[in-house]
Amino acid sequence: MDEDLVVALRLQEEWDVQAARRAAAREPLSLVDASWELVDPTPDLQALFLQFNDRFFWGQLEAVEVKWSVRMTLCAGICTYEGRGGMCSIRLSEPLLKLRPRKDLVETLLHEMIHAYLFVTNNDKDREGHGPEFCKHMHRINQLTGANITVYHTFHDEVDEYRRHWWRCNGPCQHKQPYYGYVKRATNRAPSAHDYWWADHQKTCGGTYIKIKEPENYAKKGRGKTKAGKQPTSAVENKDKLCRGEAQPLIPFSGKGYVLGDTSTCPSAGKLNTSHMVNDTKGLSGQDHSASGLKLDSNVEVKCEQNGLPNKKPHLVTPLPTASHQSVLSSYFPRVSVANQKAFRNVNGSPVKSGTIDGTKHSASAGAQRKVPPSRASLRNSSKVTAPASATVTSAAGTSAAISREESGSEDQFLNKRPRLEDRTALNNIKEQTQSGGDLEDSSRPTAISTPRSSGGQRRLVNCPVCQGVVLESQINEHLDRCLEGSKTNLRPRRV
């Protein structure tokens, strides 16, 4: 009996333990539970802020900004508010909190959210930042979550880890508490008049701050950054020099003696030698060759030499024309005086009209003029209209501009042109003279003159079947009407 009781009690204890475990598993985890370090070691700051706003602050912090700060090393967090209706911002120190457990991040965020809630709801009645109103909300959240939100953080070791620049005063304040003349900062900024306590220190102590500690290799890193800043520039310059195949500074393009787009380099001080072989130019040098006769746009093949070693690759350049070059090139590039070689001939590079002995009399360089014969009278308007009396065509010496063959032959084409015949005018003249009783033979003469080349239908003559007279085919119908009606007019038709 006793043994059964002992077994029953033991089973009951085991059952109670299991029930307690199940009940504890159903309860939500605390915000600062140790298991969060494994489940979510690096939580999302925005997600935590939204969750805490809905749970502890009734959604009043929707307009508040929260973000990380990478330069803040003296405090874990800060909350700023710009007046009533202004912007509220929460900034957490990334350098300090990344070295602390997740619990410290949650408690610091809730601490700053309490400050933001007091700012937003205009309930900031506390003379100090952590007065009764702040403590009321702090205790409320600590009871709900089991967290340990405090007024001040205890991250002193982390703060000292970042304060690696130390200065100490050599005056009397080095023996006074609590600082003993030390100034520790995370940045390399020596104590100066920009500090709010500088004036009091000068009055009470008057000592000078001397730097006694800094991070290892800090000075070398500064010099290394300066050298590294200069190194890319020299590397770029060396790379450009290697691409150009030279170790000398880049010479700007002078515009002479180079071919744009050519990859090979040609020195500006190289010698330019023409590839044409000149045998004897004594006879040609005596002749007068004008500078306009030289074709400057012709490409001359030259060689580029430097240090006595000529390059095999030729370059196309345009050298400046000189008197010797003109005499040489004129023998290889003969000049054409005019395009119309039938009317003019070439005499020493000047156009001279064919059939004349004295070349200077009719040369174009002397400014002579050539008259164009007038054309025939225009037959269309039945009036004598002559073309311009003369057309002056002047060609400069040594150029290829002259009268073309089309201009010279345009006059013959105009003379051989057939004028258009105004048939209606000619027929009206015949009709009027016939009705007035005039002689058809006399009236036909101006008609024949005005219409020398009419069409076949107008010039064709037919015999009248009534009076057997010869009449124009175009007038046969009217003539037959008069003959058949027995017109009183006794006119007989004449031969046209």
Swiss-Prot record:
This is DNA-dependent metalloprotease SPRTN. A motif (Nuclear localization signal) lies at residues 412-423. It is found in: Nucleus; Chromosome. The lineage of its organism: Eukaryota, Metazoa, Chordata, Craniata, Vertebrata. Homodimer. Interacts (VIA PIP-box) with PCNA (when ubiquitinated). Interacts (via its SHP-box) with VCP/p97. Interacts with RAD18. Interacts with KCTD13 and POLD3. The active site is at E112. It comes from Rattus norvegicus (Rat). Residues 346-459 are annotated as: Disordered. Its main location: nucleus. Autocatalytically cleaved in response to double-stranded DNA-binding: autocatalytic cleavage takes place in trans and leads to inactivation.
